[in-house]
Swiss-Prot record:
A Pfam family hit: A_deaminase
Gene name linked to the record: add
Official protein name in the record: Adenosine deaminase
Cofactor note: Binds 1 zinc ion per subunit.
InterPro entries, sorted: A_deaminase, A_deaminase_dom, Ado/ade_deaminase, Metal_Hydrolase
Organism encoding this protein: Edwardsiella ictaluri (strain 93-146)
């Protein structure tokens, strides 16, 4: 199902949602932190989804053990480096890794700017070492409120030259996008691209808000766009990309089954949508699973799966020249 002549791309992949269970165990032992289990297989159910959970917030709780072991900036740097190693191992040609410095810092009171620097350092070093190009997306975790997001934005802006875009993630129902208009104005003024988690836990209005009030060029998840025919038309006509995460949406009970996921309808409607992992270590999957197992189960035809792969490159926050480099690299293989 994957076209080997074309780049394999993951655009919606949380760095802080992809901390290896083995690394959680090792860092917990290194820093003498209490974990729910002291052996890998016993720890796995606490940090990885084995079945669907009732809602997004329950899913996010699985991520908490990963950030609970980030006791130092060196630990942050390590997980950043390992994230890029995981891309190489998964056969991914380009990725945009997103991270929330506040979420990563808050358990152990790490300096926000230090976390940003550690992530940039770890990703840059690994990208050079393993040869996978990566861009970073900064996340504001809306769950912590407007002031925490302002602090988070300040820290991210300290690394503005190494960050490509700003995202808003977390509790979509409790903290709607209109609370963060001024934050996104600053991000756009800094020259960043904008992608927003919307239409996952909340309805189509959340997506309209992300587009009209926050300036979203891409929508993370966007499942509930299917509720609004006018929005579907708008997404297609204005080439606003949808970062689809099939397995994640099943595991969070955002959709009751993969067969009922709207991605196939998005593609039929001419919406530029692609396939992504979201939080691969928590989900226990990789990008190839989304192409080879999840997408067929969601009713995508072979042609739609290929189109989703092609869409990944067109949606990427890359210059035309950077996109051509990725195309050329595959054709030379």
């Amino acid at each position: 199902m994957i076209d080997s002549r074309f780049p394999l791309i993951d655009l919606h992949r949380h760095l802080d949602g992809n901390i290896r269970p083995q690394t959680i165990l090792e860092l917990g032992q290194q820093y003498r932190l209490a974990l729910p289990a002291n052996e890998l297989e016993a720890l796995r159910p606490h940090v990885q989804i084995s079945d669907s959970v009732p809602d997004l917030v329950s899913f996010l709780q699985k991520l908490d053990w990963g950030v609970a072991v980030l006791a130092t900036l060196d630990a942050c740097r390590r997980v950043a480096y390992e994230n890029v190693e995981d891309l190489k191992r998964a056969g991914i040609d380009y990725a945009e890794l997103r991270f929330s410095p506040y979420y990563m810092a808050q358990r152990h009171g790490l300096p926000l700017q230090g976390v940003v620097e550690a992530i940039i350092d770890g990703v840059s070093a690994a990208s050079r070492d393993v040869g996978v190009p990566v861009k970073l997306i900064g996340i504001m975790s809306r769950t912590f409120g407007q002031e925490a997001c302002r602090q988070e934005l300040e820290a991210l802006l300290s690394g503005r030259e190494r960050i490509a875009a700003l995202d808003l993630a977390g509790d979509e129902l409790g903290f709607p996008g209109d609370l963060f208009r001024s934050h996104f104005t600053r991000a756009r003024d800094a020259g960043w691209h904008i992608t927003v988690h919307a239409g996952e836990a909340a309805g189509a209005e959340s997506i309209w808000q992300a587009i009209r009030e926050l300036g979203a060029e891409r929508i993370g998840h966007g499942v509930n766009a299917i509720q609004d025919a006018r929005l579907m038309d708008y997404l297609a006509e204005h080439a606003i990309g949808v970062e689809a995460c099939l397995t994640s949406n099943l595991q969070t009970s955002t959709v009751p089954s993969l067969a009922q996921h709207p991605l196939k309808h998005f593609l039929q409607h001419g919406i530029i949508a692609n396939l992504n992992t979201d939080d691969p270590a928590v989900e226990g999957i990789e990008l190839r699973h989304e192409y080879q197992t999840a997408a067929p189960a969601a009713g995508l035809s072979a042609e739609q799966i290929r189109q989703a792969q092609y869409n990944g490159l067109s949606m990427a926050f890359l210059s035309p020249a950077e996109k051509q480099v990725l195309r050329d690299a595959k054709q030379m293989c």
